[in-house]
Amino acid sequence: MALNKSMHPRNRYKDKPPDFAYLASKYPEFKQHVNVNLAGRVSLNFKDPCAVRALTCTLLKEDFGLTIDIPLERLIPTVPLRLNYIHWVEDLINYHDSDKTALRRGIDIGTGASCIYPLLGATLNGWYFLATEVDDICYNYAKKNVEQNNLSDLIKVVKVPQKTLLMDALKEESEIIYDFCMCNPPFFANQLEAQGVNSRNPHRSPPSSVNTGGITEIMAEGGELEFVKRIIHDSLKLKKRLRWYSCMLGKKCSLAPLKEELRLQGVPKVAHTEFYQGRTMRWALAWSFYEEVIIPNPPKKRKLEKPRKPMVFTVLESVIKLLTEKLPSGSEVPESITLVADCIKKILTDLKVQHKIVPCGRDEESLFLTAVENSWIHIRRKKRDRTRQLRELPRAPNDFLQSNKPDALHKETSDQGQNSGDPPATKESESVTQSETCVPHTSSTPESAAPALSEPMEAENSDSKPDEVCNNDEEQDLGEDMKQSCGEASSAPQGSGSPFLFKCVLNVKKENSDVLVEMHCVEGQNRDLMNQLCTYIRNQIYRLATS
């Protein structure tokens, strides 16, 4: 279940996720980690730490102009998630509605090897950061990343003793008021919890990405709950030295007890939010001792979108045998999947539903369908209507037809042209085609035939179905001519601005001795039409087998 639609509204990846194909074409170091399947779809193995690191470094380079190095044995941050946190801090300090020239100061508790929060905050907003770190490897990489991006004037990386949070870090800068602090605390209390042995619901699927964090980055005594409580206790001493204290949580169950702790301590302002990105969800908590600060609006309740199930029907083995018997004698008998797929292609061609073969896995056939008009509903009724309308077509009187003998044709037409100025009369087959079928033209027939001709033509125009008025032996050609001459619109939905009714992928696959047909909706609002087409295809396959 992808959560990108619920990202922070200012997150650049909300509506435009990273284009792996483009990034691979531009960055060779990223290209070596990209996989391309038979359908041409580009993907990345998020369980490979080298691939995750390549993606993070490539996104920072492409979208923010930042060059960083991250060791594989330390935490590799994902850019969209960190960007969500930065944007929420902007909301907390009312950054976009205030004087942007004023210097904003922040603290990043446990900045990590990437130093990603200070790098993003300084690059996007020009914020000043005090970044603390307890791990030697992370500290050295963080300093290097700041220096190679020429941000030493805005970011100060400080090595602090173990278990140092805010109090010891601010001893040397006792006069400075900071606007905020950020923290991505260690989520787990022990190794078993970090591996998901005793903390993860057994019904949940395993994580989709790899965890490369070091011991100090992913584990702390008491887990994230106790870690954040220590920050709360530091804030009770520092109080208004910081306008906002904040932290990000990896477990929803940590949020309620921490909010209760803040309530018990009498903290006046508390805010929380949720971060969505990819298949990952995080929670954030912030509190302030300033009465005048404005709390951002809480996140809206997110409606979970249930995945749409495909429309499915099964072609039984007995039906497949009947279809095989219909094949011409002596022809090669195809596989059951191919046989059913060929039947479906013929049905779609007869319906004029656009379709093309798309790459798929073994023992499977896939078609991409684009339906631009509803050509499968009420087909039998349409045939009856055409037959009825053929019987109602006006015919010229017998005396008029007899007067059009070949010997007298030229003389008769010239006399009519001289006397009345009317155009020459033509044969019946010509009078039914082209202009007369679209617009009643009474001057080419005697007055006695005019009422009979105009009445059915008005009915045709009111129904907008002139292509249904045709002879049995010329039905197809006449219908096409009439569509061209009358300029009839297609059956696509009017006023919607969409040139199609729906798009879907049709899969034909083996299921034991039967064949399974699935239709997956790709685009289009009306699933009823797709359901109608699915039912029609199923019924036609049965008719082909039993006819």
Curated annotation (Swiss-Prot):
Location relative to the cell: Nucleus; Cytoplasm
SUPFAM superfamilies noted in UniProt: S-adenosyl-L-methionine-dependent methyltransferases
Keywords: Cytoplasm, Methyltransferase, Nucleus, RNA-binding, S-adenosyl-L-methionine, Transferase
A GO MF term: RNA binding
Keyword Transferase found: yes
Positions with biased composition (Polar residues): 431-447
Renumbered residue ranges of the record's region VCR 1: 289-398
Coiled-coil ranges per UniProt: none
A GO BP annotation: mRNA destabilization
Known regulation of activity: Methyltransferase activity is autoinhibited by the K-loop region that blocks S-adenosyl-L-methionine-binding. Upon activation, K-loop changes conformation, allowing S-adenosyl-L-methionine-binding and subsequent methyltransferase activity. mRNA N6-adenosine-methyltransferase activity is inhibited by zinc.
Binding site for S-adenosyl-L-methionine: 82, 110, 114, 133, 164, 184
Ranges for region VCR 2: 500-547
EC top class named in words: transferase
Catalytic activities: adenosine in U6 snRNA + S-adenosyl-L-methionine = N(6)-methyladenosine in U6 snRNA + S-adenosyl-L-homocysteine + H(+); an adenosine in mRNA + S-adenosyl-L-methionine = an N(6)-methyladenosine in mRNA + S-adenosyl-L-homocysteine + H(+)
EC number, as in UniProt: 2.1.1.348, 2.1.1.346
Cellular component GO terms held in the UniProt record: cytoplasm; nucleus
Positions of the UniProt region annotated as Disordered: 383-473
Residue span of region RNA-binding: 17-20, 199-211, 250-254, 277-283
Region feature (K-loop): 163-167
Domain notes: The VCR (vertebrate conserved) regions bind the first hairpin of MAT2A mRNAs. The VCR regions interact with the internal stem-loop within U6 snRNAs, inducing the conformational rearrangement of the A43-containing region of U6 snRNA, thereby modifying the RNA structure to become suitable for productive catalysis by the methyltransferase region. The K-loop region occludes the S-adenosyl-L-methionine-binding pocket. Upon activation, conformation of the K-loop changes, allowing S-adenosyl-L-methionine-binding.
General function of this protein: RNA N6-methyltransferase that methylates adenosine residues at the N(6) position of a subset of RNAs and is involved in S-adenosyl-L-methionine homeostasis by regulating expression of MAT2A transcripts. Able to N6-methylate a subset of mRNAs and U6 small nuclear RNAs (U6 snRNAs). In contrast to the METTL3-METTL14 heterodimer, only able to methylate a limited number of RNAs: requires both a 5'UACAGAGAA-3' nonamer sequence and a specific RNA structure.
Sequence similarity: Belongs to the methyltransferase superfamily. METTL16/RlmF family.
Protein name, entry field: RNA N(6)-adenosine-methyltransferase mettl16
Species assigned in the record: Xenopus laevis (African clawed frog)
